[in-house]
């Protein structure tokens, strides 16, 4: 259907750029026809917790996953790849938020457009103004470097009768 990912082409592209692509698929997703071993592509096991890996990545490519909102905290580039958007929505897959309003940013609706975006991508890219707006809606104004201090203070000042000694 032309909407899937050509792993051979992607791997060749990654080899030339000395880059590694990590796939973390939805646990219900079954991968077929991945009989070759790719030098620059890894499929993470469905049980792997991807969150400890995220700070060491340069870019997130995602479809409808809520990881989009968590990755905003890293102030790194995000490419949305809803290649099956029409099919996804037609199957009455409810999203928690309006997809267009709450996932701003660069979008690729086909593998060809994804490859074009990756070819031109500047890995120094940070969040767009709209992505920062969404980050503020979900995470507030607290700078991440102070988050532990702010959370501790909140617990102490607003906690129940259980006191926290620090």
Map each language-model feature to its residues.
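Short, contiguous acidic/charged loop-to-helix segments that flank catalytic cores in large enzymes
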Residues: 43-51, 102-105, 141-142
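Donor nucleotide-activated moiety binding/catalytic core segment of transferases
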Residues: 22, 27-69
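A generic local structural motif
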Residues: 7-10, 46-49, 66, 93-94
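C-terminal alpha-helical cap of glycosyltransferases
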Residues: 144-166
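Conserved catalytic-core segment of nucleotide-activated headgroup transferases in glycan assembly
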Residues: 1-33, 108, 149
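Catalytic binding pocket for nucleotide-activated donors in carbohydrate/polymer assembly enzymes
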Residues: 32-39, 66-139
């Amino acid at each position: 259907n032309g909407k899937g990912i050509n792993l051979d082409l992607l791997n060749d592209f990654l080899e030339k750029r000395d880059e590694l692509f990590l796939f973390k698929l939805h646990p219900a997703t079954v991968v077929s026809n991945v009989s070759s071993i790719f030098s620059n592509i890894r499929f993470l096991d469905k049980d792997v917790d991807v969150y400890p890996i995220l700070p060491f990545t340069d870019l997130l490519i995602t479809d409808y996953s809520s990881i989009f909102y968590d990755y905003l905290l890293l102030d790194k580039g995000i490419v949305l790849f809803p290649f099956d958007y029409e099919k996804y929505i037609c199957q009455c897959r409810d999203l928690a938020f309006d997809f267009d309003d709450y996932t701003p940013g660069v979008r690729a609706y086909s593998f060809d457009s994804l490859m074009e975006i990756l070819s031109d991508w500047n890995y120094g890219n940070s969040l767009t103004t709209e992505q920062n707006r969404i980050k503020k809606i979900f995470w507030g104004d607290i700078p991440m470097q102070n988050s532990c201090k702010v959370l501790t203070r909140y617990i102490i000042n607003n906690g129940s009768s259980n006191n926290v000694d620090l």
